[in-house]
Regions:
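Helical scaffold of the NTase/Pol beta-like nucleotidyltransferase catalytic core
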Residues: 131-133, 163-190
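Conserved His + Asp/Glu catalytic blocks
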Residues: 169, 187-190, 196-202, 213-236
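Short acidic (Asp/Glu) patches
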Residues: 128-130, 193-196
Length: 236
């Protein structure tokens, strides 16, 4: 800040600046996609391993902040429960909050999930994304994007989002999309938030799912009781 490189010496302005520097070292979006597709032809896991490492090495996923998160498991009557406290999202300082209030509202990108975030320089009320890359996917015959969450709630926490800025909607097609994804990446799980406020996801304005390479305690819980539904006896 003393040299005039930063408007203020705060985490918001430091993030904008170091992301701008990282942009000089990043492979172009098309190069990342090409490398991913080459590795995917050998193994889907090799492709995601490469992409996840790139997302960390580029500082898009800030490992030094993720390390501050607190995670533990506790036993319960229904099995173990995973608990995590996310401490890696940077707190905005008062000067950045004041600047954001005075800043002209651009409306671009429309939200934090839109594909237009790739390469975006950012502003005080929107993170810089010059170090951000996405992988295009075809899901349910429509264009979607695959990326990692910069805050990583669990291992290889990924986000799969519609290329169109459409609102969240749980319907029959939702399950088709989920199954299409795990056919592409059988080593991952994927799920959907509810399309309702409060109990749903934090960005209901943009259709998306969340997945990753992690086994939750719920997946390891023993069966309490089994039953069948008439007409669907083959479903377990």
């Amino acid at each position: 800040a003393k040299r005039g490189l930063l408007e203020h010496n705060s985490v918001v302005y430091r993030d904008l600046f170091d992301t701008k520097l990282m942009d000089c070292l990043m492979p172009r979006p098309g190069e990342v996609v090409k490398k991913f597709e080459e590795l995917y032809a050998k193994s889907p896991q090799e492709a995601t391993d490469y992409f996840y490492k790139l997302s960390q090495d580029s500082n898009y996923i800030r490992r030094y902040r993720i390390a501050k998160d607190i995670r533990w498991s506790v036993p319960s009557a229904y099995g173990d429960i995973d608990i995590s406290i996310n401490l890696s999202k940077p707190e905005k300082d008062p000067k950045a909050i004041a600047a954001a209030k005075l800043a002209k509202q651009s409306g671009y990108p429309k939200c934090l999930l839109c594909k237009e975030n790739v390469g975006y320089a950012g502003r005080v009320n929107h993170p810089a994304r010059q170090n951000h890359r996405i992988i295009p996917l075809t899901i349910n015959q429509t264009e979607w994007g695959f990326q990692y969450s910069p805050y990583v709630y669990y291992n290889e926490h990924c986000i799969v989002f519609n290329f169109q800025h459409n609102p969240m909607k749980i319907e029959r097609a939702t399950f088709v999309k989920l199954f299409d994804f795990i056919k592409l990446f059988p080593h991952y799980f994927i799920g959907s938030n509810a399309d309702l406020p409060i109990v749903g996801g934090s960005i209901l304005s943009h259709d998306h799912f969340q997945g990753g390479h992690y086994t939750f305690a719920m997946a390891k819980a023993p069966v309490i009781r089994s039953f069948s539904v008439k007409g669907y006896e083959d479903v377990t």
